[in-house]
Design a protein with these regions (language model features):
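Helix-to-loop junctions at the C-terminal end of transmembrane segments
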Residues: 36-48, 255-267, 352
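Helix-loop boundary and gating motifs at the non-cytosolic
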Residues: 1-31, 207-212, 220-231
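C-terminal membrane-cytosol helix-exit motif in multi-pass small-molecule transporters
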Residues: 154-179, 374-379
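Intracellular juxtamembrane helix-capping segments at the cytosolic ends
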Residues: 8, 91-104, 308-321
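Hydrophobic core of transmembrane alpha-helices in multi-pass small-molecule transporters
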Residues: 76-91, 294-308
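Cytoplasmic helix-loop-helix junction between adjacent transmembrane helices
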Residues: 84-118
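Helix-loop-helix hairpin linking two adjacent transmembrane segments in secondary transporters
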Residues: 116-165
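C-terminal ends and interior cores of transmembrane alpha-helices
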Residues: 58-73, 278-290
Length: 387
């Protein structure tokens, strides 16, 4: 997934020769995730979480190969097909968050979801290494280095099938029989009170959580897609851009475990609000910066803010949703989040083309104000309990 913000905008500009459509790659990925999110959620609610993860791995593998071939052939149409397939796979694999929510008791649900995000550190760490390897092999073999980076992705995907197979029983089954796996105190000490809430209260909590996730996801994708292109305009090397994206990803995932623990300890709401504020501050820093390290620091903060707001929102949604409907609930969150991730990069491209990166940063900061106001209205009595 980290190859998309690293290479996607550059590939589109190379294939089309127009920076105005630089966000198209990220938007295509988001569109495919929009189209699959809810349906994969229904699939996992009916057939278990592992079914969704297997589907996602297969689609990701095939999509990466198609993108690599499209780059070699110089075909934008084939590139779009590959991005659609790859994006669908990435979207399906997101059911891992539902699996984590299923496998942990309410008092540790934030921690469980955050551990999945921690696993993404592998991707953020391996991405610059993969790009660096592709650069060296590309020069040695006379192959386009960007295409080669995508063609190497299946080597990383194949071992994941064995990891998914090792999960027993299916996480959904664990959620339905939670008392078999955890002591009573762990189940009662915190967590969902969805049965006690009326439909209006449930709706308010879900809207606040989904709006926060949608905004911070769209803002993060927009900033990342455009800043990669801005760094390219500063004559930064592909390795420098990849390193910048890796630092952004470190912000997204490196602190997710303590953030998840914090959400379990002090509540989902304060963690979400803090994340939104940090994401807005990072966007402002990007808008004010002209150099490599200032922009990179800003995108790191955007990633860190995303971690708090997005993980907290996912945890809040699962708090008020029973196991038999969690896949669909997170599917709805994914649908709207990726709809924002689809449209905002295109808007970001137009802002950069019509104005500059400074205006993009200010716009990114303004986006978080609405979810901050809505989330402030949520009443969380204790972590995972709402009224």
């Amino acid at each position: 997934m980290q190859l998309v913000p690293t290479l996607g905008a550059i590939q589109v500009v190379t294939l089309l020769g127009n920076a105005a459509f630089a966000g198209v790659a990220t938007s295509i990925m988001a569109f495919s995730r929009v189209m699959t999110a809810y349906f994969v959620g229904r699939l996992t609610d009916q057939h278990g979480r592992k079914a969704g993860m297997y589907l996602g791995l297969w689609l990701s593998l095939v999509g990466a190969l198609v993108i690599g071939m499209a780059t070699l052939l110089g075909s934008f149409a084939l590139f779009c097909v590959g991005a659609l397939i790859f994006g669908s796979g990435v979207g399906a694999v997101q059911q891992m968050r539902v699996a984590a929510a299923d496998m942990y008791p309410p008092s540790r649900r934030g921690e469980g979801i955050s551990l999945v995000a921690m696993g993404s550190l592998f991707g953020s760490g391996i991405s610059p290494l993969l790009v660096s390897l592709a650069e060296r092999l590309g020069k040695l073999l006379g192959i386009n280095e960007i295409a080669l980076a995508w063609l190497l992705v299946p080597v990383l995907v194949l071992p994941c099938f064995l990891l998914v197979k090792s999960i027993r029983p299916d996480p959904k089954q664990i959620a339905l029989e939670m008392e078999k796996y955890y002591p009573v105190w762990a189940l009662d000490s915190a967590g969902s009170n969805s049965v006690e809430l009326d439909r209006g209260d449930l709706l308010r909590v879900r809207i606040a959580a989904i709006l926060s996730a949608v905004t911070v996801q769209g803002q993060m994708v927009m900033m990342m897609a455009m800043t990669a292109l801005a760094l390219k305009a500063l004559d930064c090397s592909l390795s420098q851009i990849s390193f910048s994206v890796a630092l952004h990803a470190m912000g997204m995932f490196a602190f997710s475990w303590p953030i998840g623990r914090l959400a379990d300890r002090i509540g989902r709401k304060p963690v979400i609000l803090a994340g939104l504020v940090v994401a807005g501050s990072g966007a402002l820093l990007v808008g004010l910066g002209d150099g490599y390290w200032v922009i990179t620091t800003g995108t790191f903060l955007v990633g860190l803010g995303w971690s708090g707001a997005f993980l907290g929102s996912n945890t809040m949604v699962t708090d008020v949703t029973p196991p038999t409907k969690r896949g669909q609930a997170i599917g709805v969150l994914e649908l709207w989040s990726n709809a924002a991730g689809m449209t905002l990069p295109i808007l970001g491209g137009l802002i950069v083309e019509g104005f500059d990166l400074h205006m993009l940063g200010f716009f990114g900061a303004l986006l978080v104000l609405i979810p901050i106001f809505v989330m402030a209205q949520v009443r969380e009595q204790r972590p995972g309990n709402y009224r």
